[in-house]
Swiss-Prot record:
Keywords annotated in UniProt: Cell inner membrane, Cell membrane, Ion transport, Membrane, Potassium, Potassium transport, Symport, Transmembrane, Transmembrane helix, Transport
Species, as recorded: Geotalea uraniireducens (strain Rf4) (Geobacter uraniireducens)
Annotated family: Belongs to the HAK/KUP transporter (TC 2.A.72) family.
Name of the molecule in the record: Probable potassium transport system protein Kup
Transmembrane segments: 17-37, 45-65, 96-116, 140-160, 165-185, 211-231, 246-266, 286-306, 338-358, 367-387, 394-414, 417-437
GO cellular component term of the entry, any: plasma membrane
Keyword Ion transport annotated: yes
Disulfide bonds: none
Catalytic activity: K(+)(in) + H(+)(in) = K(+)(out) + H(+)(out)
Coiled coil (residue ranges): none
Amino acid sequence: MKKHTESYWEGVVKSMGLVFGDIGTSPIYTLTVIFALTKPTEANVFGILSMVVWTLIILVTVEYAWLAMSLGRKGEGGTIVLKEILIRLLKPGRQIAFVGFLSFVGVSLLLGDGVITPAISILSAVEGLVLIPGLESMRLGTLILIAALIAVVLFIFQFKGTDKVAAAFGPLMVLWFGALTVSGLVSIATFPKILGAVSPHYAINFFRDNGISAFFVLSEVILCATGGEALYADMGHLGRRPIIRAWYFVFVALIINYLGQGAFALQHGDAKNFLFNMVQGQSQLLYIPFLILTILATVIASQALISGVFSIVYQGITTRIMPLMKVDYTSSHLKSQIYIGSVNWFLMLLVIFIMLIFQKSENLAAAYGLAVTGTMTITGIMMTIIFAHTTKKWKVPVAVAVTIVDVVFLISNLNKLPHGGYWSIILASVPFATILIWTKGQQALYRALKPLDMETFLLSYEQIYAKGKNITGTGLFFTREWNVIPPYVVHCIIRSNIIYERNIFISIVRTDEPFGLKSELKTGFGPGLDAFEIKAGYMEVIDIEKLLKKHDIQEKVIFYGIEDIATMNPVWRVFSVIKKLTPNFVQFNKLPASKLQGVVTRVEM
């Protein structure tokens, strides 16, 4: 969370580095892609610029900065937070199931987007090299190789933690937005009439004159708003106010640059890349420094997105919608600075694969946008339901209007499906299938295990304990709930008579708040039998050993259950493989290996 001592400008600069990289690098390719398909006549340029301005106002300012960011949980934002808010508001049943399904789709689309964004950002920046005198004949393969190498270096650096270099991200992005503003203003000065394009009537005229083709242009216009969802998703890192303050500056810089590119497009309609050609035309001397700044900005944008993917996956793990994975904490003072190796390398391979498949940023733009509009539509639907169930009912009409705009953009983006848009669906289907198999598998496994209730367990436990053949010391037994006894505990204590002088059932309960940590030792359930319950927020990092020491628990051995799944069902077979490949509960929580004792239970599913 944001420190209270942080100044106004510190918060703004940090936000620019951590939140606005993606949306801030959109000017590199947005208008270039649009005008490759639509001739840059005066009516078209004014109409499209008007659409860009109003897309940024409606989808980013209204939907995210105003509506979504008013829905935080202890300062946290994002799709999973919306789901947690809704679960509290709705009655159990179909509505909850629908919200769960929506949030799974939203999370999957965001994770799929985590592959396309770094690929298009880095490729589009590297393509600016061909405008440097002497490099005009650089081959496409060389450009892809340079982009792939930048991506590899970026992903290798993740393990070290970006804590040390993150301090430079903010100032670099301030420089980037400053450069966008200055180049935009210089270009606007050559054609001041372009400022009139902010009027919505040009967008309306464009729709009136072009009909259905104008509707499909929306699928390219959305490129200007990609990364808008980061305002809400990254709220937990910086707080609401610094992000909104920074957005005002970013918004102005983007609008000025898009208007400048529009003025340039009217005079140089045949330009290969409007941003790069515009800057090169203004100053040949400053073009190379600007290109270096562009590459740095796209790396920062990609970095923010990778950190966002780690954060989403961690939320998914702790809310039990995703399998456990090895998590490393790369910062001693920032809880949100995490690294998930398996996700990092998988993401790197996919980014390079996508670069090789699409080869050019304009080709990638054909696949880009579908996931973003899908995420925005889901956010709109979930927000509307929340406002309808709270005291903020007056926001419902605005949320409905914004969601309708989201749906219009989503439908226009369906046109991209045959042109590479299907990659968005393929990339999102991997996490979506994993989430579905994992959540359904966990439920089926819990039913198949047939756990005992505490009363039935105590009948046998007390008889065995009374015999007095108990092992000296303390034995810990991990259970999902302290009062529901899993089969492995029954096997250990009742069947095998492995019973200690002191036996403690330990359970971890994740609350629907992002942060907060409570631990409680409940004593006297039976002779030598206690329960230790840890309640933690779903973003909270738990040090179990520290909590045990705090309650003066000196454990001799820690028991945990391992399920050996036997099944003929192909879906449960996949679930079983995922379970075997991913760390188990005790590995995830980094407990001392010397004290651990896994107990295998064979389960028929």
